[in-house]
């Protein structure tokens, strides 16, 4: 090949290489622009401080994917790509914050669960954030509400009071989850405002927490899951005191494989003389729980404290239902939900750690938390101490 041909070939190759480089740089720039545009539209949640204890970060990263997979299995949902958003806090209108950290769990780009890290046992409530032991819990708590505005260029504060949970955005306060209290008005917009002190504290935070996917994904594994056969969520408690009625109905329907039981009918059986108007105010006492179970052919007995993981595992295998009895840590005598009852649905091992899966009658989904935690941080920002169990439904 003569020198002119060589030069021509070299020039052609050079032009091709330069063109490819320009195209690749353009693609890289467009990709970065797409990422920047995507992140610019991400929802941001205001926090007083973006500092999170290292043990909280580590626990969240280690546990979130396994928890999400286990909960998906309970609802027969397909698993997907799980990612963890950044931690956020929930505040009262006067600026007080609770002792928990919340993370959005994102599956295939959609917020599906909320991971909550809260004090593990009652003794931890008096410890500092750095010293306390944390329990990890997952549920669908406000996940759908966050997902609805995830891709908006929004900046919100998550607030709570006795009526429920709110999103504050541009000075407007909107109720997103109402508490199960009688005569609770489920107003879409509230006249409440954030206290000036909280506004000032939120302004001092350099970076609000972002609801966006993190790159690092842990390969959490669900080694074992044992579920009470035939358990289904058929109803939900709201403005009544029938938590034990709901729990007993759900457990008996599961262990008898029927749709016969419901909370209203159980409460009507326990209070035959009470009017329909007054029935929602009737609660259930331990002796009634035992007697009703016996009337349905079940040998019910009370057991103090939290049953061991192995006991739950065996009872669940034997198709025997367990009802959780819990008491509010606040001990407020005016609280209509001072005591609460829940149903144990399953147990699991996630990354070799023992977990319990339960149903809170206030919710339409299940929750998972550590099996050795006696403190239940429930969906309405209330801490309950699991003090005993009714076994045998």
Swiss-Prot record:
Prosequence residues removed at maturation: 37-219
Cellular component aspect of the GO annotation: extracellular region
Activity control note: Prematurely activated/folded staphopain B is inhibited by staphostatin B (SspC), which is probably required to protect staphylococcal cytoplasmic proteins from degradation by SspB.
Top-rank lineage group of the source organism: Bacteria
PTM (free text): Proteolytically cleaved by staphylococcal serine protease (SspA).
UniProt subunit comment: In the cytoplasm, prematurely activated/folded SspB forms a stable non-covalent complex with SspC.
Function, in words: Cysteine protease that plays an important role in the inhibition of host innate immune response. Degrades host elastin, fibrogen, fibronectin and kininogen. Blocks phagocytosis of opsonised S.aureus by neutrophils and monocytes by inducing their death in a proteolytic activity-dependent manner. Decreases surface expression of the 'don't eat me' signal CD31 on neutrophils. Cleaves host galectin-3/LGALS3, thereby inhibiting the neutrophil-activating ability of the lectin.
Name of the protein described by the UniProt record: Staphopain B
Originating organism: Staphylococcus aureus (strain MRSA252)
